[in-house]
Amino acid sequence: MTTDIFFNPIWDVRLTDTSLRDGSHHKRHQFTKDEVQAIVAALDAAGVPVIEVTHGDGLGGSSFNYGFSKTPEQELIKLAAETAKDAKIAFLMLPGVGTKEDIKEAQNNGGSICRIATHCTEADVSIQHFGLARELGLETVGFLMMSHTIPPEKLAQQARIMADAGCQCVYVVDSAGALVLEGVRDRVAALVAELGDDAQVGFHGHENLGLGVANSVEAVRAGAKQIDGSCRRFGAGAGNAPVEALIGVFDKIGVKTGIDFFDIADAAEEVVAPAMPAECLLDRNALIMGYSGVYSSFLKHAIRQSERYGVPAHQLLHRAGQRKLIGGQEDQLIDIALEIKREQESGAAAAR
C-alpha cells in the first residue's frame, strides 16, 4: 500500500513534538490521561503537525528493565488520536522491544506514523518492520540512534538500508547530544546525497551540550526536511531542542513550519511545564553525557544506581561513555556502580 508523506506544501520543514515520548524518560513514564489530553490539545491548537506518543523506549517498553508505564501506552495513543483535530499521531518502536502486533494495535488506536529505531550500525534489523508498516498503510520514519558514533559515509550506508526497506524519512539521531554543528551538517548532507528523492532526511537532537537548536538549524541548512523537538526541552538527559525556541529561530531565519510562535510558547509555559516533574537541566550529569557520548535515557537509570550504591552519578555516566554503552544496556550501570564502589572501599582501606 502506498502512503504519501504528510507534508504541507507551505512548510519548509515538518516538526514533530516528542514531549509525550522522549519526555516519558524524564517523567519516568508516569503520564496520566489528563496530561496527555491537555498537551495534545495545546500542541494541536498551536499548529504542531506531528505529535509522538509512546513509552520512552517505544512500543512495549513498559518493563522492569526500562520502567513501567503508569497508563498503558496504547490507551494514551488512542486518547491522543481522539483529541487531535489536525495533528497526526506518531509512535516509536524498537525492534526487539516492540512487536508487529504492537504496531497493528497502535494503528488501530489512531497512530498513523510509525517511527522505527535501531542503533546506527544495525539498520538491517528494521527491514521486516518497515515492510509491515508500509503494508499496513502507515507513514514510516527511521531512527539511526547514536549517530555520533560512526562517520557520515557509514551512516549514509545504513540510511540506504532503511530507505530500501520502505522508510520514507531517515533521521540522524543525536541520542547522546554529542554532535557539534559540523558533525550534524556533515551527517545530514551525507544522507541527503545518498537518498536523493528516495526518502527525506530528519534530525533529532538533545541539549546535553546546549546545542539542540543550533544543531537543528545546521540540519535544516544541510537539507533536513523533518526536525524533532520537545516543548520545554521535555526529554531524556538535558532534554530535546525546545520546540518554542526552534519555532522562534526558524521564524527569524525564514524557515516555515506552520506553527505559531506565540501559541507554542503559551503551550510550553502553561500546559507542558505543569506536567513536568522538574525542568530538564543542563547540569553536570547532562554535560558528562554529551561530552562522553552517553545515550540520554541513561540519566535516570544512573541517578537511581547512584542513590542505591552511594556512588556519583556523573562517574557512572562517564564510564558508560568510556565503555561505549548503547540503548538497551542500562543494566550495565549496576556493574559500573559496583566497580566504583569497590574502588572507593579499596581506597578507603588503603588510607587507613
UniProtKB/Swiss-Prot annotation:
Substrate binds at residues 21-22, 175, 204, 295. GO terms for biological process: catabolic process; L-leucine biosynthetic process. It comes from Mycolicibacterium paratuberculosis (strain ATCC BAA-968 / K-10) (Mycobacterium paratuberculosis). Residues 13-265 form the Pyruvate carboxyltransferase domain. This is 4-hydroxy-2-oxovalerate aldolase. The keyword RNA-binding does not apply. Its EC number is 4.1.3.39. The record marks 21 as: Transition state stabilizer. The keyword Kinase does not apply. PANTHER family: 2-ISOPROPYLMALATE SYNTHASE 1, CHLOROPLASTIC-RELATED (PTHR10277:SF9), HOMOCITRATE SYNTHASE-RELATED (PTHR10277). GO terms for molecular function: 2-isopropylmalate synthase activity; 4-hydroxy-2-oxovalerate aldolase activity; manganese ion binding. Pfam families: DmpG_comm, HMGL-like. Mn(2+) binds at residues 22, 204, 206.
